[in-house]
Amino acid sequence: MKNSVLILALSLLTWLSSCSSAVDAGKINIENWKSDRYGCKGLRLQDAEEFRTIKNQFLGIDNQALIKTFGRPDRVELVDKSQSFFFYFLEPSSDCAGVELKKEPLRVLFRMNALSKVSEVTVTDQNP
């Protein structure tokens, strides 16, 4: 009986420690980031320079930690079975009401590998 309680407690502890948690995003205002879906309000653009300086610290984190940190991505693109992209728009995208695009909006691209880990972080106005 004591062994089964000990095994259950250790299993629970292992399971809880394996869950992803949010990543430190430096001076980026995460509340503004999460409330600015598709970059419509322009709040994410205020943190673009800060993001550029810390973007490499997100390499290797899993997709769940990314979602817990920045919220649900504005767009997800599955390239093939081995990689996908998470898009977070810094400038208003075509999904914003009343926005007429003259150029592609600035966005953050997180490239996810087959293990759902971030393998590349890019700030660009180009599609992958």
Sequence positions of predicted segments:
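Residues within mature, well-folded domains
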Residues: 20-128
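Positively charged n-region of N-terminal signal peptides that target proteins for export
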Residues: 1-4
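C-terminal motif of bacterial Sec signal peptides marking the signal peptidase cleavage site
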Residues: 15-18
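Sec-dependent N-terminal signal peptides
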Residues: 6-13
